[in-house]
């Protein structure tokens, strides 16, 4: 009987890809098969996020719950950014944990599972960081890491501490992985990096210098890959050359995530973001002039230390002007190893929560308005999933919108045109042409 693996993944797309990496390693090298029931698992992995405090606090209650439910001989491993941050503290607080594996060490999973109380949390570079996973949870889409770590020093962000110095993956390895994925039937690749468009600034050893824009051009030449996406770019590095390539390259999906964080130039300066409200708006206007169909998503933090009502209204102003399609928004959470952690001018919790509610409520209205405008429009959709119980196929447009259509397995993996006939906040309903 094969060994069973259960994995819980929290946080960003980087964590999702790290989990895919560990699953593929354990399936190929250790004979594990995936289960969605922790009670039958021989190995339970919790791949953690530490961007905010709440998920970190919740980790230990989850460990306690898994410890009660698991088979007596089953092991629990804590992986990811909280593992990098807390290290051996996890073993002290949760004796039922067998090992701790940091975000930069996921390639060591096959070795660590055989060690009792191992702690692997180094954030320095080693060649194993470039190992690509051999599996994906989707037959038609795949994620590829093109850089590891982050060199930015945003005042609120713990990621440079948990994921280490930024290193670019050599382009020949990325292109080789893209060709392998294409040969396996993958149609769409999502390129991953903490500051993905900062790619090419540093390699581990002697490699040809290549920029992110040049990498996009080369990847678009890979036969079989029909769509390219990437996350998350930094607004500061969205130069005109990049924007022109984004707009003119037909394989680059016209959907982009531009983390704003705040619409106040004063708060952006305190955050150490390196740009102003004016710069951000300028980049959006330039992008829309080149590719008006582009949809834009963002991240926003409300209640950053010192944020006034006027500062918050600056954020609301940008929301109105840009009309973001997707919004990931949170109340500021102080994190250790960050500049802002020691600041005392915190915003009252009730005030911050009320601002978050206003922001999210207005965004919901904007999203409904944007989606209603899609009725009657024609889009090309890559069909990714089938909801057999409901008879629907699901996929995404080039602009990143979720579409449902009545249909069977014959659509899966194909890109077909549809006309949008109904619109809801979370998805659109299409009909084939």
From Swiss-Prot:
Coiled coil: none
Main location: cytoplasm
One Pfam entry name: TRAM
Residue ranges annotated for the TRAM domain, each copy included: 372-433
Gene3D superfamilies (alphabetical): Methylthiotransferase, N-terminal domain, tm_1862 like domain
CDD domains: Radical_SAM (cd01335)
MTTase N-terminal domain segment(s): 3-118
Record key words, sorted: 4Fe-4S, Cytoplasm, Iron, Iron-sulfur, Metal-binding, S-adenosyl-L-methionine, Transferase, tRNA processing
Positions of [4Fe-4S] cluster 1 binding: 12, 49, 81
Top-level class of the enzyme under EC nomenclature: transferase
UniProt xrefs under InterPro entries: Elp3/MiaA/NifB-like_rSAM (IPR006638), Methylthiotransferase (IPR005839), Methylthiotransferase_CS (IPR020612), Methylthiotransferase_N (IPR013848), Methylthiotransferase_N_sf (IPR038135), MiaB_methiolase (IPR006463), rSAM (IPR007197), rSAM_horseshoe (IPR023404)
PANTHER family, per the entry: CDK5 REGULATORY SUBUNIT-ASSOCIATED PROTEIN 1, MITOCHONDRIAL TRNA METHYLTHIOTRANSFERASE CDK5RAP1
Assembly mode: Monomer.
NCBIfam families tied to this protein: miaB-methiolase (TIGR01574), MiaB/RimO family radical SAM methylthiotransferase (TIGR00089)
Annotated family: Belongs to the methylthiotransferase family. MiaB subfamily.
Full protein name: tRNA-2-methylthio-N(6)-dimethylallyladenosine synthase
């Amino acid at each position: 009987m094969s060994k069973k693996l259960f994995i819980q993944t929290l946080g960003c797309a980087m964590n999702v890809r790290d989990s895919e990496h560990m699953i593929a390693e354990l399936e190929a090298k250790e004979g594990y098969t995936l289960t969605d029931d922790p009670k039958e698992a021989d190995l339970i992995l919790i791949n953690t996020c530490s961007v905010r405090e709440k998920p970190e606090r919740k980790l230990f209650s989850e460990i306690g719950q898994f410890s009660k439910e698991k088979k007596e001989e089953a092991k629990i491993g804590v992986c990811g950014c909280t593992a990098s941050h807390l290290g051996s503290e996890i073993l002290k607080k949760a004796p039922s944990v067998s090992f701790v594996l940091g975000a930069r060490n996921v390639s060591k999973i096959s070795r660590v599972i055989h060690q009792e109380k191992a702690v692997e949390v180094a954030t320095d570079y080693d060649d194993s960081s470039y190992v690509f996973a051999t599996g994906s949870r989707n037959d038609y889409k795949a994620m590829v890491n093109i850089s590891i770590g982050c060199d930015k020093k945003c005042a609120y962000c713990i990621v440079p501490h948990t994921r280490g110095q930024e290193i670019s993956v050599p382009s020949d390895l990325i292109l080789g992985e893209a060709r392998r994925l294409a040969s396996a039937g993958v149609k769409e690749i999502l390129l991953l990096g903490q500051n993905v468009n900062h790619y090419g600034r540093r390699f581990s050893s002697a490699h040809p210098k290549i920029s992110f824009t040049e990498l996009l051009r080369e990847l678009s030449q890979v036969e079989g890959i029909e769509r390219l996406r990437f996350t998350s770019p930094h607004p500061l590095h969205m130069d005109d050359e990049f924007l022109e390539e984004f707009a003119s390259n037909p394989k680059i999906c016209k959907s982009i995530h531009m983390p704003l964080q705040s619409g106040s130039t004063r708060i952006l300066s305190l955050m150490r973001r390196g740009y102003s409200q004016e710069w951000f708006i300028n980049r959006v206007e330039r992008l829309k002039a080149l590719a008006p169909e582009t949809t834009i998503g963002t991240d926003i933090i409300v209640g950053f230390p010192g944020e006034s009502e006027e500062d918050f209204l600056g954020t609301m102003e940008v929301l109105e002007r840009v009309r973001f399609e997707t919004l990931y928004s949170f109340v500021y959470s102080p994190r250790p190893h960050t500049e802002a952690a020691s600041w005392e001018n915190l915003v009252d919790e009730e005030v911050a929560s009320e601002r978050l509610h206003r922001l999210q409520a207005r965004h919901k209205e904007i999203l409904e308005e944007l989606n209603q405008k899609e009725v009657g429009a024609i889009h090309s959709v890559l069909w990714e999933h089938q909801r057999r119980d409901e008879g629907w196929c699901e996929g995404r447009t080039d602009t990143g919108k979720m579409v449902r259509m009545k249909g069977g397995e014959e659509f899966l993996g194909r890109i077909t045109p549809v006309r949008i006939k109904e619109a809801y906040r979370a998805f659109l309903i299409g009909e084939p042409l």
